[in-house]
Amino acid sequence: MTVEMSVDRSSFDEVMVPCYNPMEFIPVKGFGSRIWDQQGHEYIDFAGGIAVSCLGHCHPVMVQALTTQANKLWHLSNVMTNEPALRLAKKLTQVSFAEKVFFANSGAEANEAALKLARRYAADVYGPEKSEIIAFNQGFHGRTFFTVSVGGQATYSDGFGPKPGDIVHLPYNDLAALQAQISDRTCAVMMEPLQGEGGIVSPSAEFVQAVRELCDKHNALLIFDEVQTGNGRTGDFYAYQGIGVTPDILATAKSLGGGFPIGAMLTTAKIAEHMKVGVHGSTYGGNPLACAVAEAVVDFVAQPEILAGVKQREQWMRAELEKINQKYQLFKEIRGKGLLLGAALNDEWQGRARDILVAAGKQGLMVLVAGASVVRFTPSLIISQQEIEEGMARLDKAIATLM
């Protein structure tokens, strides 16, 4: 029988690789949009595990799906398929443009699969010289060597030796730069339909439409990284549906499992046929436990009233942030869409987003940052208006301590 060992925050420094700098408190229980730490302190969660906990913590629909599947079948590998994976794949094709699905364990793996597929497709159809990948500065696509190199942030990609080649980074939303770079050598353009880690930056409608047209002109694939924006986060099931531009390949993860690790790459049958047996794979991809939970999440989030509710909650969040800004005048703008929002700090507050995050934690509120000067909010898609107002009151108190 396993004996539960006593651990605290100092245990992290003792035994964990120092990739992270976690908060001083350790959550031990969560329900809905609230969590409690080892000392019993309660927090309202506006972070959602970085846009993951779309139904909050321990939602009964997810708990039931996991419990039921846990009593049936845990793992097979892809030597065999399984019912939850097939049902989930069917449902993902029903809520998107896709005809084919590849399952992985994370957003990074989904993006890795997307990039490999794009390169494979281009080589098969047009020849090996068509290999250039265009991505954008301040983008973020994961931490594998390929995806972190495609992501346009040197902080994450430098220091590991030679990078994968034929990757070009351009300014986001800069159509002239894209027009000057894209050519018949371009294999794919990869972008977030709303940059998350890069500061919650939305593209213009004209830019996204032009990207699609330029990709078509040069026979390049358009890859949308919807790891953070997907599964209802923006008020559409996928963000591309709200901007009227359909990609060729889409990567999804985070909210897909609502907290249970899963990722997926979605594409068309024509493109997918180039990923033949043995070309790519994942031992855990399509795991029955993960797919059972994700199926429950998709069923819940895809309801029209849930998606409409995300848009309503965006308005509640914006109204409360405007109240705070009228009082303290520290935000220059509120960015984003749905429940992927960022409060960009003004010149006087530049670089102090983490100060606000830490102060908020001391007041019982969990928030995120998106760079040094943007406070990010990615709460549950079904957080109540009362919890939004209460959380914002705690944010108000936190900011007051920094004035």
Swiss-Prot record:
Enzyme category, top tier: transferase
Q: Is-annotated flag, keyword Transferase?
A: yes
Positions of pyridoxal 5'-phosphate binding: G107, A108, F140, D225, E226, V227, Q228, T283
Q: What is its EC number?
A: 2.6.1.11
MF GO annotations: identical protein binding; N2-acetyl-L-ornithine:2-oxoglutarate 5-aminotransferase activity; pyridoxal phosphate binding
Q: Which PROSITE patterns match?
A: AA_TRANSFER_CLASS_3
What biological process terms from GO does the record include? Answer: L-arginine biosynthetic process
InterPro entries, sorted = Ac/SucOrn_transaminase_bac, AcOrn/SuccOrn_fam, Aminotrans_3, Aminotrans_3_PPA_site, Class-III_PLP-dep_AT, PyrdxlP-dep_Trfase, PyrdxlP-dep_Trfase_major, PyrdxlP-dep_Trfase_small
Q: According to its record, what are the GO cellular component terms?
A: cytoplasm
The cofactor note reads: Binds 1 pyridoxal phosphate per subunit.
- Location (main, coarse): cytoplasm
Q: Catalysed reaction(s)?
A: N(2)-acetyl-L-ornithine + 2-oxoglutarate = N-acetyl-L-glutamate 5-semialdehyde + L-glutamate
Could you list this entry's UniProt keywords, alphabetically sorted. Answer: Amino-acid biosynthesis, Aminotransferase, Arginine biosynthesis, Cytoplasm, Pyridoxal phosphate, Transferase
Its UniProt pathway annotation is:
Amino-acid biosynthesis; L-arginine biosynthesis; N(2)-acetyl-L-ornithine from L-glutamate: step 4/4
Q: Where in the cell is it found?
A: Cytoplasm
Using the record's annotations, give every residue carrying the modification N6-(pyridoxal phosphate)lysine.
Answer: K254
Q: Which residues bind N(2)-acetyl-L-ornithine?
A: R143, S282
The prosthetic group or cofactor this protein requires is: pyridoxal 5'-phosphate
Please verify whether the record's keywords include Transferase: yes
Family from the record: Belongs to the class-III pyridoxal-phosphate-dependent aminotransferase family. ArgD subfamily.
Summarize the subunit comment.
Homodimer.
Extra info from the record? May also have succinyldiaminopimelate aminotransferase activity, thus carrying out the corresponding step in lysine biosynthesis.
Q: What is the name of the protein in this document?
A: Acetylornithine aminotransferase
Query: What organism is this sequence from?
Result: Vibrio cholerae serotype O1 (strain ATCC 39315 / El Tor Inaba N16961)
